[in-house]
A protein has these predicted regions:
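Divalent metal-dependent phosphate-bond-processing catalytic cores, especially two-metal-ion Mg2+/Mn2+ enzymes
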Residues: 1-16, 26, 66, 83-212
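His-Asp-centered metal-binding catalytic motifs of divalent-metal-dependent phosphohydrolases/nucleases
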Residues: 16-39, 54, 76-84
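Inter-helical turn/loop segments and adjacent helix faces that build the functional surface
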Residues: 2-10, 36-41, 61-72
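Alpha-helix capping and helix-loop boundary segments enriched in small/acidic/polar residues
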Residues: 42-49
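Short acidic alpha-helical/loop segments enriched in Asp/Glu that coordinate divalent cations
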Residues: 35-37, 70-73, 117-124
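Histidine- and acidic-residue-rich, metal-dependent catalytic cores
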Residues: 49-88
């Protein structure tokens, strides 16, 4: 939808579209353990560093598919899907590359939150991953362990605020509402936002009634 609504000189073009697709497909590759890794038992242990690990994977992988020239861009824009690098510190020379990053980060969050099973995954899958990754019970500077998420249900209780912050600060904020570029493909509708709103409304209802 982006190229449909912009002048030729502003369009991303086929190569950048391919770049975005490749990074989208492998943006979570940093969760994968190396075959010789005897230190970690589960990929979830890489939660805090998986984006940087994914960037290193792209450094190795992209030259094997003829995209070596895009490695410097790919290893930067992958960080639009994570929290390891502040967006202002992501260095890109071409505004079109930054736009690809915004579209990538937008697609990542919208795909997650619009999933029909997103809420169940947060409770049943994401919480155990957060425990293994040190996110649920982070260790502070003084060495004490804090409780950020006490359980899967506690994670669900905090999910509405996360979703609202993501929409406000990421989708509408840092990414400038790029999710709207999908709307020309659906006659002005945005099924992803509709699904997110539906899940958020349902979750609030469940939290009020405590009918888990």
């Amino acid at each position: 939808g982006y190229d449909r609504t912009h002048a030729p000189e502003l369009r991303l073009g086929a190569e950048r579209a391919l770049l975005g697709l490749v990074v989208a497909l492998f943006h979570d590759a940093g969760y994968i353990r190396q075959t010789d890794d005897t230190q970690h038992r589960n990929g979830a242990e890489f939660t805090r560093t998986h984006v940087s690990r994914g960037a290193r994977f792209l450094e190795r992988y992209m030259p094997t598919i003829g995209l070596a020239n895009w490695v410097p861009v790919a290893t930067q824009i992958i960080h639009f899907t994570g929290y390891e690098v502040p967006f202002g510190d992501i260095r890109l020379d071409d505004a079109r590359d930054r736009r690809v990053g915004h579209l990538l980060g937008t697609a990542d969050m919208m795909a997650q939150m619009s999933d029909r099973c997103y809420l169940e995954k947060c409770r049943d899958r994401l919480y155990p991953e957060f425990v293994l990754g040190g996110v649920a019970l982070p260790v502070g500077a003084n060495g004490d362990r804090a409780v950020k998420y006490a359980s899967g249900l506690d994670l669900l209780r905090q999910t509405p605020q996360f979703m609202e912050d993501t929409i406000q600060k990421r989708l509408d904020g840092a990414f400038h509402g790029d999710y709207r570029y999908v709307e020309p493909l659906f006659d002005g509708r945005n099924p992803y936002i509709e699904a997110i709103d539906k899940s958020l409304s349902f979750l609030r209802q469940v939290l009020r009634s405590e009918s888990w």
